């Protein structure tokens, strides 16, 4: 009997080695060679466990008989133990079939594994294999797009874990341990670690399911718990963990939970640094695998950096929304009010919330806290505070650009440059000095303009439109600032007038480039604008109209031409909305002003014509 059992164990372990280790070296033309051999060995194990049964029906037949597995199989074994061993073999066969893309057969074995263990699912021998079968059925149904079915399996696994821990609480036996010799048996500590890892997988898959079901808050909670447990049980890949934590931070950003977001990002930095030593470029040149690994690490580091950039951008953006008045300028009264209120609230809030979200144990706590202290999580309320957030964001911009370069990563690189531009735009809001604010906007033009000139609209039409519109907006904003500076002078000097005109003409140029991109191949402007470009196109028309009105000229004829161009653009908006009533709701403010200008400008033009006639 002992020799028979030794043969069973050796056959099972050989199957696992083939499946988990040797399969990695299978040739490309036989990618599943080791998996198929492992399957044959697992079937042998099943026959050895139940020699008197038909191979295809022994496990199911035993469970369906009144007495269950104890009524047959190897003499002297308890029904519970035999059931557990059979369930493990069925579970492994289920995995084997899913790994070789035979999903229906895989499902059949996984369901059979669960059915065998149904009565014993709360036992030390059975709980782990039962939960793992449920987990894998959840994955299988999720891959089929049947998310609700996946949810039922995974929530069943979660519920069983809670019930087992409440009613039994002992370290569960790992499935493979059923085929270990006495000397190979796991310690209670190792059993606990493996069982908790199984449950962590349940939570991880549930997080994905809730995300698919648009239950974002629940998905975030499960993701957070998964990350905490992976640290607690030292069961994680540092790079994957860091990416998942950085991704979770973006959810917290959308909820304006900046302390939680910062904590996730700081922890991501600390755990990412635990990834193995990045190989030198020289070593990578000699080893293709090392080169791939180096590239992956650089990419993931850049992705985490981009999450930090989004954190800084959103923190500044939300601060701006709190502080701006009805014309988009910083409201000093609100600023003082928020400063007074912040100190009272922040300390208590941080203390309470931190208890709920802390990652990891004392060994990484200090490092995470040090990373957190490099950037605030409360809204900046003045230029000094905003600049500190800006500098952190800019540092991560530079870090992300190291990997996402224009050559090879066009879209990503341009998004990063656009984020850099947005950082300058948000910082400019906090700057009181108009000249310094202009310089910040000039930095934006300097970084965006070369990209706009370099990209071919034939291949990057949407990106080109974004750049054209942002360049136009930035020039428009600079012109407004220069007008405000000029208005403070007793008399506007020639240099200021030239600058205002130059900026206005640049803004007009880019708005018109944007509008031209909407034309058909035969250069006709669309009679009806698509919904996604309707508001941008109307805003462009409105601002072109206003810009022509801002151009300064001493030549009456040029003044008349500019007013006419201004009128034409205002009139376009009014006429378009007259024909397309549904457009009114997205352009209400601009439409009202356009109607006023359409009524006023002809009178102004007539007065100017009379003046010109009197001088001729």
From Swiss-Prot:
It is found in: Cytoplasm, Cytoskeleton. Its main location: cytoplasm. It comes from the Eukaryota. Keywords: Cytoplasm, Cytoskeleton, Developmental protein, Differentiation, Neurogenesis. Residues 59-78 have a biased composition (Basic and acidic residues). Pfam families: KBP_C. GO terms for cellular component: cytoskeleton; mitochondrion. Residues 52-78 are annotated as: Disordered. GO terms for biological process: cell differentiation; mitochondrion transport along microtubule; nervous system development. Gene3D superfamilies: Tetratricopeptide repeat domain. InterPro entries: KBP, TPR-like_helical_dom_sf. The keyword Cytoplasm applies. Coiled coil: none annotated. Activator of KIF1B plus-end-directed microtubule motor activity. Required for organization of axonal microtubules, and axonal outgrowth and maintenance during peripheral and central nervous system development. Belongs to the KIF-binding protein family. This is KIF-binding protein. The lineage of its organism: Eukaryota, Metazoa, Chordata, Craniata, Vertebrata. The gene is Kifbp.
């Amino acid at each position: 009997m002992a020799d028979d059992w030794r043969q069973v164990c050796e056959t099972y372990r050989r199957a696992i080695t083939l499946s988990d280790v040797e399969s990695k070296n299978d040739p490309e033309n036989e990618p599943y060679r080791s998996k198929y051999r492992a399957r044959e060995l697992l079937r042998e194990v099943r026959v050895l466990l139940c020699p008197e049964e038909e191979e295809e029906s022994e496990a199911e037949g035993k469970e369906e008989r009144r007495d269950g597995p104890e009524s047959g199989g190897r003499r002297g074994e308890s029904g519970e133990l035999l059931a557990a061993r059979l369930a493990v073999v069925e579970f492994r066969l289920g995995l084997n079939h899913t790994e070789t893309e035979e999903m229906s057969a895989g499902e059949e074995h996984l369901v059979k594994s669960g059915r065998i263990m149904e009565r014993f699912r709360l036992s030390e021998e059975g709980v782990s294999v039962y939960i793992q079968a449920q987990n894998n059925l959840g994955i299988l149904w999720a891959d089929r797009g049947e998310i609700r079915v996946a949810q039922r399996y995974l929530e069943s696994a979660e519920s069983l874990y809670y019930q087992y821990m409440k009613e039994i609480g002992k370290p569960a036996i790992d499935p493979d341990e059923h085929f270990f010799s006495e000397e190979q048996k796991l310690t209670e500590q190792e059993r606990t670690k493996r069982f908790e890892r199984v449950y962590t997988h349940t939570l991880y898959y549930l997080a994905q399911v809730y995300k698919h079901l648009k239950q974002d808050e629940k998905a975030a909670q499960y993701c957070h718990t998964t990350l905490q447990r992976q640290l607690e049980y030292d069961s994680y890949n540092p790079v994957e963990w860091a990416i998942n934590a950085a991704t979770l931070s973006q959810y917290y950003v959308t909820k304006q939970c900046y302390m939680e977001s910062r904590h996730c990002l700081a922890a991501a930095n600390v755990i990412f640094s635990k990834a193995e030593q990045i190989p030198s470029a020289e070593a990578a040149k000699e080893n293709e695998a090392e080169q791939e690994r180096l590239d992956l690490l650089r990419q993931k580091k850049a992705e985490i950096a981009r999450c930090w950039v989004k954190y800084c951008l959103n923190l500044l953006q939300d601060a701006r929304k709190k502080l701006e008045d009805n014309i988009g300028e910083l409201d000093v009264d609100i600023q003082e009010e928020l400063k007074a209120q912040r100190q009272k609230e922040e300390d208590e809030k941080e203390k309470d919330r931190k208890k709920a979200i802390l990652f990891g144990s004392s060994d990484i706590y200090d490092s995470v806290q040090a990373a957190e202290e490099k950037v605030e999580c409360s809204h900046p309320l003045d230029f000094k505070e905003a600049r500190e957030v800006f500098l952190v964001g800019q540092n991560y911009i530079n870090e992300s650009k190291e990997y996402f370069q224009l050559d090879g990563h066009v879209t990503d690189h341009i998004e990063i440059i656009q984020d850099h531009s947005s950082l300058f735009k948000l910082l400019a809001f906090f700057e009181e000095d108009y000249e310094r604010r202009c310089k910040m906007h000039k930095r934006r033009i300097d970084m965006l303009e070369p990209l706009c000139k370099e990209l071919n609209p034939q291949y990057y039409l949407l990106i080109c439109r974004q750049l054209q519109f942002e360049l136009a907006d930035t020039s428009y904003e600079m012109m407004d600032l220069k007008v405000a500076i000029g208005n403070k002078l007793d008399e506007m000097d020639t240099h200021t007038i030239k600058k205002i005109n130059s900026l206005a003409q640049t803004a007009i140029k880019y708005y018109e480039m944007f509008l031209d991109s909407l034309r058909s191949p035969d250069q006709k402007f669309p009679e009806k604008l698509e919904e996604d470009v309707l508001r941008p196109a109307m805003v462009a028309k409105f601002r072109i109209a206003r810009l022509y009105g801002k151009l300064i000229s001493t030549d009456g004829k040029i003044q008349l031409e500019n007013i006419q161009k201004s009128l034409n653009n205002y009139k376009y908006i009014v006429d378009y909305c007259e024909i397309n009533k549904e457009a009114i709701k997205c352009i209400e403010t601009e439409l009202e002003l356009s109607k006023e200008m359409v009524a006023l400008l002809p009178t102004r033009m007539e007065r100017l014509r009379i003046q010109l006639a009197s001088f001729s």
